[in-house]
Design a protein with these regions (language model features):
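Glycine-/small-residue-enriched transmembrane alpha-helix faces in small-molecule transporters
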Residues: 1-38, 72-75, 79-83, 126, ...
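C-terminal-most transmembrane helix of multi-pass membrane proteins
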Residues: 2-3, 44, 202, 238-283
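Transmembrane alpha-helices of multi-pass small-molecule transport proteins
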Residues: 26, 33-79, 107, 123, ...
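Hydrophobic/aromatic residues within transmembrane alpha-helices
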Residues: 30, 39, 43, 87, ...
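Specific alpha-helical transmembrane segments that line the substrate/conduction pathway
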Residues: 38-41, 45, 85-115, 150, ...
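Helix-helix packing/entry segments at the starts of transmembrane helices
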Residues: 42, 97-99, 160-182, 214-250
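Loop-to-transmembrane alpha-helix entry segments
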Residues: 64, 97-100, 110-131, 137-144, ...
Length: 283
């Protein structure tokens, strides 16, 4: 779809990144009240409703192949978000995003297998080592492992998203995927007990979270992808760990040490470098 605001593509991507990270900051603010699993369930569930209204997918027209991939796509989407929220309930958002980013970064690099790409692998390993739980910074090991697991689900989401984009329209795929994401993570939200305490204020915050983390960035990114080369888009997305750290600092007063900032920088440079030196089509 074309953005009615006619935002130029590069600012649109930057706004989308900021929107997602502001959403993550709002989400973390809800953790003390309803918990990470319930927050993820609330966000994904409301996102599914919003996107279903916006794109009105016709479930009766899906064939067996579409059902197969959209279910797997939805499960990876839901688990990626829930595991990430569980991670940032234990470690700072900026570090959680940095560690999660390793998943798609490694996927992109090893899909190429060129010598120069191993430089980016090494740099990303340095970034992980700088914030590893066995270092002197005392990070929560379960938070680190959950962030890395979220990265695995993110890589799966990218692979499945690429396949499903060839057999379904983008908006329809995401809307149906969100429905299955809700199915897979809603039980965790219910069993955690967090959803039992929902009230109008929390529902409004949940709706804002769904808009900031799903509807707004999805719309902006779809419009930008039609105008930007894939490489440029990937380089811009490399800013995400830094943007996450900035949003967490502004909204949650989460401060990173110099070592942790260096770790974020290593992953940002590795991701940008991988995108810049990538071979591939511009469309």
């Amino acid at each position: 779809m074309k953005s009615r605001l006619n935002i130029p593509p590069i600012p649109a991507v930057i706004i989308a990144i900021l929107s997602v990270q502001c959403g993550a900051a709002i989400a973390k603010g809800l953790f003390p009240e309803i918990g990470a699993a319930a927050t993820a369930s609330l966000r994904i569930g409301l996102s599914a409703i919003i996107l279903s209204i916006a794109f009105r997918p016709n479930l009766l027209k899906l064939n067996a192949k579409q059902w197969k991939y959209v279910i797997l796509y939805g499960f990876s989407l839901g688990l990626m978000n829930m595991v990430f929220y569980l991670s940032i309930s234990r470690i700072p958002i900026g570090l959680g995003v940095t560690l999660e980013f390793i998943g798609p970064l490694v996927l992109a690099i090893f899909s190429s297998k060129r010598v120069i790409d191993f430089i980016w692998v090494t740099l990303s390993i340095v970034g992980i080592a700088l914030i590893a739980p066995w270092s002197s910074n005392g990070l929560n090991i379960s938070g680190v492992l959950l962030a890395l697991l979220a990265g695995v689900f993110w890589a799966a989401y990218i692979i499945l998203g690429g396949r499903i984009s060839k057999i379904m329209k983008g908006g329809e795929a995401v809307a149906v995927g969100m429905l299955f994401a809700t199915i897979i993570i809603l039980p965790f939200g219910i069993f955690s007990g967090g959803l039992s305490g929902l009230n109008p204020r929390l529902l409004v915050l949940g709706a804002a979270l769904a808009l900031l983390s799903s509807a707004i960035p999805f719309t902006l990114e779809i419009g930008a992808l039609k105008q930007l080369p894939a490489r440029t888009f990937s380089i811009l997305m490399s800013l995400e760990p830094a943007m996450a750290s900035l949003a967490a600092f502004i909204f949650l007063k989460e401060h990173l040490s110099l070592t942790e900032c260096a770790a974020v920088g290593c992953v940002v440079i590795a991701s940008a470098g991988s995108s810049f030196t990538a071979r591939g089509n511009k469309h």
